[in-house]
A protein has these predicted regions:
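Structural alpha-helical scaffold elements that stabilize or flank donor/cofactor-binding regions
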Residues: 146-147, 221, 453
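Short, small-residue-enriched loops and turns at beta-alpha junctions
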Residues: 124-125, 161-163, 358-360, 407
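Internal gly/pro-rich beta-alpha loop/helix module
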Residues: 152-153, 158-267
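Generic structural signal for helix capping and beta-alpha/helix-loop junctions
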Residues: 102, 126, 212, 330-331, ...
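Small-residue (G/A/S/T)-rich helix-start motifs and N-terminal tracts that mark the onset
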Residues: 1-98, 225-227, 236-403, 407-418, ...
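Nucleotide and nucleotide-moiety/phosphate-recognizing core
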Residues: 47-160, 166-205, 369, 378-382, ...
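Short gly/ser/thr-rich secondary-structure transition/capping motifs
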Residues: 121, 130-140, 209-213, 274-279, ...
Length: 469
């Protein structure tokens, strides 16, 4: 990624995410040169909070804001943001979920008139009484939760990218009381910029605390955000499900990172890079030069799958479609895509399994037998006993395996085999290969299980969902 122009750099930053380690490495030279990243981050956060309040018709001077502040730099970002908001008239209470607070941020917040509520009896925060009883600790925790529940805005600055994974202790209890405990958020899908109009609004500082920063997993309590203000570069959890569902609208604050030498961990498919994969037609093209796609899809029970898959194939600029399936599907395909050709023949790519049940009728059995026979040509031998036929498998045309064909997949296949399961289908495929996993496990850690499926089968994995991996 050397030699990025600023336009290209910004394009990458909008469509790609970098690991927490890479972000730290990109921050380092800026910090060494005295760039005030924390002040930049906090100013952006305060600006977003003020805008959200304005959009909801709440004057900053009449607003109640609760900051959930951790001990590290993420808490410092939150404290400096809270300082700016308090300085402009907001009533802000900082709830310390750890034993310490960022020193400079805490001092500035107190000078601005901010209030502080300590939850840990063993805290070591200057000027704040500690050593209170367990009973009082419980009362303070309940008071903090009630304050947050009645606030206009909650600012989540508990951990940021300093902790990846489940929250524990006081932070975990607070998140569990105010948010969700280990499940995917049940939220209405609203157009960008729209709000439910319900308080409190939640602003996450950099990332929502408690989500898997680098893998997007949700394994414990967290507070779903309405807006996440992230700094320097997107983190994987902002793009990967299920954590991506907890981030709300994402605002990226550009720190002018030098991204040369850093490979994105996650990339979003954009119109531009999708277009790069499409072969443009040539003046002298014939239908065979443009390529032929073969489809074994649909069934008597799901004939629509045959029609949809053939119509989709016809939109991809290919030269010809060959379709194989039961009579009811053949009739419907020809009605919808009259240029389709029925029956066997040479193809340059295959799509199989969509709408094919697991042998509910004799026609289904015939289709499954046809698919199984095709898939044998893609089977690789074991690493311990390589076979000359492996070269032939690698030379086979690209193949998409979906739905009813997934259970017919050989043990190991070359990477031009693309499997397209949803969570339940992937769980079944993995279970058949000895993994102890169900659909909910896949939904909670989709990246982990998609990678595991690739490791076990060798196939390219496209795990379908609201966000597809």
């Amino acid at each position: 990624m050397a030699g990025q122009t600023d336009e290209n750099r910004l394009h990458v930053l909008r469509h790609a995410a970098f690991t927490a380690r890479d972000v730290r490495e990109m921050e380092r030279p800026l910090l060494e040169n005295g760039v005030p990243l924390m002040r930049m981050a906090s100013a952006a956060t305060a600006h977003v909070v003020a805008e959200m309040l304005e959009d909801e018709g709440v004057a900053l001077e009449e607003s109640n804001i609760v900051l959930l502040a951790g001990s590290g730099d993420n808490g410092g970002d939150g404290l400096f943001a809270a300082t700016m908001l308090a300085g402009n008239g907001a009533s802000v209470t900082a709830v310390a979920v750890g034993r310490t607070l960022h020193g400079e941020g805490f001092a500035a917040f107190v000078r601005a008139g901010g209030k502080v509520l300590i939850l840990d009896p063993a805290s070591e925060i200057p000027g704040c009484a500690a050593g209170f009883s367990a009973g009082e600790a419980g009362e303070r925790l309940r008071a903090a939760v009630e304050l947050a529940q009645h606030a206009h805005v909650i600012i989540d600055a508990m951990t940021g990218i300093g902790l990846s994974g489940a929250l524990h202790g006081i932070a975990g209890t607070v998140a569990s009381s105010l948010g969700v405990d280990g499940t995917i958020p049940d939220r209405t899908a609203l157009p960008a910029g729209d709000s439910t109009g319900e308080f409190p609004l939640v602003v996450a500082v950099d990332v929502p605390s408690g989500v898997g920063v680098d893998d997007g997993a949700i394994t414990g309590p967290y507070i779903p955000a309405d807006v996440t203000v992230t700094f320097g570069a997107l983190k994987p959890c902002l793009m990967l499900p299920p954590a991506a569902y907890a981030c709300g609208r994402v605002t990226l604050v550009d720190f002018s990172f030098d991204i040369d030498g850093h490979m994105p961990f996650v990339e979003a498919v954009s119109g531009d890079n999708a277009a790069e994969t499409v072969r443009l037609p040539r003046l002298a093209d014939t239908k065979y030069l443009r390529g032929v796609t073969g489809l074994i899809t649909g069934s008597e029970r799901y004939p629509g799958a045959a029609v949809l898959s053939c119509k989709a194939a016809a939109k991809t600029n290919i030269g010809m479609i060959r379709y194989m399936g039961p009579q009811v599907c053949r009739d419907m395909v020809l009605d919808a895509v009259p240029e389709a050709v029925l029956g066997k023949g040479r193809v340059q790519a295959w799509v199989v399994g969509s709408g094919v049940p697991t042998g509910e009728t004799e026609d289904d059995d015939f289709q499954r037998e046809t698919i199984a026979k095709l898939l044998t040509h893609y089977a690789l031998s074991s690493d311990d006993d390589p076979d000359d036929d492996d070269d032939l498998a690698y030379d086979m045309p690209p193949l998409v395996v979906d739905a009813g064909a997934l259970d017919l997949l050989p043990d190991e296949v070359p990477p031009q085999v693309v499997i397209t399961p949803h969570a339940g289908e992937l769980a079944s495929l993995l279970t058949a290969r000895g993994e102890d996993v169900d659909a909910s496990d896949v939904q909670n850690e989709p990246l982990h299980w998609a990678l595991r499926a690739h490791e076990l089968t060798g196939a390219t994995v496209l795990l379908k969902g609201a966000v597809t991996i």
